Amino acid sequence: MNRTRPVPGTPDADRYKWSALFNTTLGVLLVSINESILIIALPDIFRGIKLNPLVPANSFYLLWILLGFMLVTAVLVVTLGRLGDLYGRVRMYNLGFAVFTVFSVLLSVNWMHGTAAGAFIVGMRIGQGIGGSFLFANSSAILTDAFPENQRGMALGINNVAGIAGMFIGLVVGGLLAPIDWRLVFIVSAPFGLLGTVWAYAKLHDSGVRTRARIDWWGNVLFAVGLTLVLVGITYGIQPYGTSAMGWTSPRVLGTLIGGLVLLTVFGVVESKVASPMFRLQLFRIRAFLAGNIASLLAAIGRGGLMFLFVMWLQGIWLPLHGVSFTDTPLWAGIYMLPMTGGFLVAGPISGVLSDRYGARPFATSGMVIASLTFVGFLFLPIDFSYTPFAILMAINGLAMGLFASPNRAAIMNSLPPDQRGAGAGMSGVFQNAAMVLSMGIFFTLMISGIASALPRTLYRGLVTQHVPVAAATAVSHLPPITSLFASLLGYDPMSKLLGPAVLSHLPAHSAHVLTGRQFFPTLLATPFSDGLTIAFTFGAVACALAALASVLRGQKYVHAVAAPSGADARPGTVEADRTTSNEDTRADEPVLAAQGVGAFAGHSSALPPDEPEQLPEASATT
């Protein structure tokens, strides 16, 4: 049965919007938890499947288990958002919940070992990411359809809080469950996914307006292949190549990057020619949409890779130096990062509500300015810091991200015409998710550049001091920097594996004890790691400052106005098109720019021709 959501302003509509909010918040929370839950659980997963991720040949599995979920989300989110516009956002969202749940179950029934088990997890994570893409691509559009303009900031704010909080909840949940059984980190999502699937099918209803258009197959293929090549090139660029610490000069990396960029260029040309493009380039003529996405892109680049750096800093150096065993560092790293979650939980909902009244610009801009200043503050922390100032900076950084994320997301969605919200949300998601992967590539590159020159010399001197033979010390000192970073990320002590019994058994007992103890490798890594952090935090501060500048340029509060579709009327089973008027929630100095429409950056007003809307068959209103 084709069901439509109730008429706005009725009790049924009021109940429906809260059902939509709670269900989409659950979906976003599950997706974000599964983006981060493996960061902490990886050591137990690799031990469980009997695969050593520090062996160069196995680095593929480490990278793709971590990044495969994000890569597929970045590639598919705009396509699936567009499908939501064409065939119903709720229908695509419901399908996503079901797909996500099925692959969560499949991930937990892996009884293989070695590379076969690693390949299975990579494949199932990609499938799980496809389900997550359906959820991510359509949740914002569903909320924007369900809530009136003066409540969208609040609704999207709660949704954003769930998304960011889930990243940190995933760290703690992974640390708690993985030591019991690594399969629990996957199966834990299944009951919640089943609940969300049944709930969504029972309660969520599609908007009464759909877009009538053909699928842009050429655009979809060019975009998917081009972006995949670029992101794959980035993941391999941070790995060693020959005698180089990184692979940016590798023909394979250069070929994938150049090939991907060429295909994306062709994609841009195709999208400007076809009648119903997947990527509606005209949307970038809307000032609020363009500025909001640029700010989101820069913010994601500035902070996306930092979670990994904080985890490596805590797991690989700070916690071992403070007496925590390597096997316990993953859980405690997640716990020590909770102040950032607390800051975001405080600021996210409040800024979303206030942005409904005062507009996004003051909150999003100040959030990025504060975030930039916190990265400057991190520059002044010693590598073996006192936890109190670290926790304060983490909390302020989370608060800053909360100030930015909710208002910025609401401003982007408010700027879109109703029949383009799925595609627009997908385009915005592409920027955010691709920027997260790009950010990790940038931050890993900066970290490797920072430690590559000092690490070999530091390792050699430390090993020789503990009476390790020169030949063995020389071999270990050529440890690729990326291996050191991965060891820190995984909470591994690589010395016992790198030296092996053949060397350790011939050393004095005291030297062998020092080399395999908690503090030897973290102490040696501390100085080179600090050099890398300086470069990374400086980059993060600059990126967030540029995001603040983009946020300033978004202009005053703006909500897209569009005429009602032909034949639409206010009756049960139909949906009124959005109307934008000045109201009591709009301040005189922050007018709603309904007439400004698109072309604001060019200084003129123009109309964005929507695809032909299709009115769904009339049906009785249900909740």
Predicted feature residues:
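Transmembrane-helix exit segments and adjacent C-terminal regions of multi-pass membrane proteins
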Residues: 1-32, 288, 356-359, 368, ...
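Transmembrane-helix bundle of Major Facilitator Superfamily
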Residues: 2-201, 351, 378-379, 390
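Transmembrane core module of solute transporters
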Residues: 21-33, 37-70, 251-255, 263, ...
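Small-residue-rich transmembrane alpha-helices and their cytosolic helix-loop interfaces
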Residues: 28, 66, 70, 156-164, ...
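C-terminal module of multi-pass small-molecule transporters
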Residues: 76, 88-99, 104-107, 111-120, ...
